[in-house]
């Protein structure tokens, strides 16, 4: 646990059992390893993090992470979302943390270079308190589904809006459309402020918690990436897509 006390750049994977779309998702098997193990081991390949840890409120997940040799901490069941779970873990276990990356536990194919890029953004610009990745897409299924979040941003990289709808509307099809990838790098002090911002009308309407930041008048900056990630796991049927991707990345659409 010495790493907990000294780590300044921390990656945390919030994990819970009770997903409405896929109960028990963190322990679902993907080619012999669980989803949370694959996501954890993938995050470990980032060169910018001093420590990677799972934060959970479920004893089954905790025991499993410890069993495969990972670091895990228990958090309260009352956490309303993953960000609150991350903040609690940092507050209780990482007194020296300066940058905290909230890494989704259902993204086993996330490129570690994305994590590194976000950390570099915060280290290189003290004015940025929170950064998140986006990637351009021309996939009509990804553009049209409300399960994929779209983002528009200004010339400085400051996010203007996130939506489950198609933005921009793009009648002339000349403007790129960017998908949001749900990873966030926070400056430690701002993470504590973030969880205190109450839900806003737009965040509730879109079911996107990051919109509370924009509605409060604060800024989120985006990191534009290419060939960013493979399929994530939202539903049980996504397991086969991830397995196909891991076996042959070039032949899977998602």
UniProtKB/Swiss-Prot annotation:
Reaction it catalyzes: 3-deoxy-alpha-D-manno-oct-2-ulosonate + CTP = CMP-3-deoxy-beta-D-manno-octulosonate + diphosphate
Pathway(s) per entry: Nucleotide-sugar biosynthesis; CMP-3-deoxy-D-manno-octulosonate biosynthesis; CMP-3-deoxy-D-manno-octulosonate from 3-deoxy-D-manno-octulosonate and CTP: step 1/1; Bacterial outer membrane biogenesis; lipopolysaccharide biosynthesis
Any one GO cellular component localisation term in the record: cytosol
CDD domains in alphabetical order: CMP-KDO-Synthetase
UniProt keyword Cytoplasm present: yes
Location relative to the cell: Cytoplasm
Record bears the keyword Transferase: yes
SUPFAM superfamilies (alphabetical): Nucleotide-diphospho-sugar transferases (SSF53448)
GO molecular function ontology, one term from the record: 3-deoxy-manno-octulosonate cytidylyltransferase activity
Keywords carried by this UniProt record: Cytoplasm, Lipopolysaccharide biosynthesis, Nucleotidyltransferase, Transferase
Record EC number: 2.7.7.38
Enzyme class at the top of the EC tree: transferase
TM ranges: none
GO biological process, one term: CMP-keto-3-deoxy-D-manno-octulosonic acid biosynthetic process
Family label: Belongs to the KdsB family.
Reported function: Activates KDO (a required 8-carbon sugar) for incorporation into bacterial lipopolysaccharide in Gram-negative bacteria.
HAMAP family in the record: KdsB
Protein name: 3-deoxy-manno-octulosonate cytidylyltransferase
Organism name: Chlamydia muridarum (strain MoPn / Nigg)
Gene: kdsB
């Amino acid at each position: 646990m010495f790493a907990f006390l000294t780590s300044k750049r921390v990656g945390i994977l919030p994990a819970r059992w009770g997903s409405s779309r896929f109960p028990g998702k963190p322990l679902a098997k993907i080619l012999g390893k669980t989803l949370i193990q694959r996501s954890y081991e993938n995050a470990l390949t980032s060169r910018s993090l001093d420590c990677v840890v799972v934060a959970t409120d479920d004893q089954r997940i905790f025991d499993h992470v410890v069993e495969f040799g990972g670091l895990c901490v228990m958090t309260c069941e009352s956490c309303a979302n993953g960000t609150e779970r991350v903040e609690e873990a940092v507050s209780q276990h990482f007194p020296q943390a300066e940058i905290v990356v909230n890494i989704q536990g259902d993204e086993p194919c996330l490129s570690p270079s994305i994590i590194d890029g976000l950390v570099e953004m915060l280290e290189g610009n003290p004015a940025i308190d929170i950064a998140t990745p986006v990637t351009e897409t021309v996939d009509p299924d990804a553009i049209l589904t409300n399960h994929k979040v779209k983002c528009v941003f200004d010339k400085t990289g400051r996010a203007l809006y996130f939506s489950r709808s198609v933005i921009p509307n793009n009648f002339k099809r000349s403007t790129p459309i960017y998908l949001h990838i749900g990873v966030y790098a926070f400056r430690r002090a701002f993470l504590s402020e973030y969880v205190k911002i109450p839900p806003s009308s737009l965040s509730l309407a879109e079911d996107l918690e990051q919109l509370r930041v924009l509605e409060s008048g604060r800024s989120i900056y985006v990191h534009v990436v290419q060939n960013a990630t493979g399929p994530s796991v939202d539903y049980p049927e996504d397991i086969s897509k991830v397995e196909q991707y891991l076996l042959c990345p070039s032949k899977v659409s998602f």
